[in-house]
C-alpha cells in the first residue's frame, strides 16, 4: 500500500501522508464493510433526491445507478478489492464508483457528510437486523409452544430457592419462557420505531446549504420520519444502545433457560435429554455427553452485557456533535447481532430435540412435600384460618420427614393428630394430579389451562 496523502478525499489540507500505523489504527473497513448493502441503498436514495431537486443532472443519476449495480455485483461475487487506505466502507465504495463512472461518482457526496452517511447506514443495518431477529424469536417461541403442547399434562416440580415448591407441568414451564421472549420481541419492535428515523440531510452537523428533500429520502428508504435536529442526528447512538439493551435482556432470558437445561440434563436430576446433535463429548472421559450449547449460550450472555457496557461508556463523555469515538460503536453492535441471531437459530432447533423424562420428574415430586400448600388450602376450606393451617401442615411435614415418607403416605389418623378437620377426602387433594387440576384458572398450571394457553399462544403467533 502507498502512503500518498492525496489519495484521501480529505487530503487537500494536509502536507504530509498519514503514517501506516495511524492508517491501521483508524481504519474501520475490516469490520464496517458488512454494511455495504445499506451504504449503497442510502447512496442511491440520496442520489435520486439530488436529481429530483435539480442538484445533480439526470445523466449523473443514471451513471451512479449503473455504477452501483456494478459495485454490487463485484461485492457479491467477491471481486471487490477493499482497501485499508480508503479507511471505511463509504470511501471504498465511492472510490470504486468514481473509477467506473467518472465525475458523476464525485457528485454523489454533494450535500452529505460521512457523519450523516454512517448514521444512516447503522440505522438501516439495525432495522434489517431487528426484522431478522423478530422472525427468529417467532420461530423459537413457536418451538416452545410445540413443546408445551406435547407436555401440557406432564407433572414436574416447580421450584423456589431451588427447593421443591409446588407441582406444575412442563408445558406450563415452557410457556413461561414463551411469555418472556414475547416481551423481548415487543422491545425490539418498539426500538425499531426510534431506529427508523433518517439522519441524512444533517450533513456534518449543521445541515446543508443545498435545497434537499429529506422526507423524500426517508420515504425511499422506508423510514418513518427524519431526525428533527441535525446535531442529534449525527452525534447520538442511543438507538444503538437501546437495541443492545434489548439484546442483553433477551440473552438474560436465554441464559436462565440454559441454566435450567444444564441442570435438568444432569444425571443427578435427569429431567430431560437433549439430542446428540446439540451436545459434545470429552477428550478423556468416554461416557460424557455435555450440554455445550446451553452452556455456551450462558457464557455468551456476559459477552452481550459487555457490548452494552461498551456502548454506554463510549457515549457517556462525548460533547456534541460527531467524534471519532463513534467509530467504536460498530463492533459491539455487530457482535451483539451475530450472537443473538446465532443463539436464536440454534435454540429454536434445539427445542425440538428435547426429550422429557416424565418418570424422573414425577419421582422428584415425591421428595419435597410438593402438595403441602394444597393441604393448607384444604384446611382453610374446612374453616381453619390460613396461618393456623400453615402451622398445622408444617407439623405434618416434619412428622412425614421424620418417618421418611411424603404427605400422602401418612395415615388419616396421623394427619388428624395435627389437623383434626382432616377427613378421608384429603387424599385426593394430596395427589400431584389433584394439585395440578385444582389450579384451573387463566395463568394456572392445570393441564386444561395449559392447553388453552397453548391455543392462545398459537393465535398470538399467527
UniProtKB/Swiss-Prot annotation:
Keywords: Amino-acid biosynthesis, Arginine biosynthesis, Cytoplasm, Lyase. The keyword Cytoplasm applies. It catalyses: 2-(N(omega)-L-arginino)succinate = fumarate + L-arginine. Pfam families: ASL_C2, Lyase_1. InterPro entries: Arg_succ_lyase_C (IPR029419), Argininosuccinate_lyase (IPR009049), Fumarase/histidase_N (IPR024083), Fumarate_lyase_CS (IPR020557), Fumarate_lyase_fam (IPR000362), Fumarate_lyase_N (IPR022761), L-Aspartase-like (IPR008948). It is an enzyme of class 4 (lyase). CDD domains: Argininosuccinate_lyase. GO terms for biological process: arginine biosynthetic process via ornithine; L-arginine biosynthetic process. GO terms for molecular function: argininosuccinate lyase activity. It is found in: Cytoplasm. Belongs to the lyase 1 family. Argininosuccinate lyase subfamily. This is Argininosuccinate lyase. The lineage of its organism: Bacteria, Pseudomonadati, Pseudomonadota, Betaproteobacteria, Rhodocyclales.
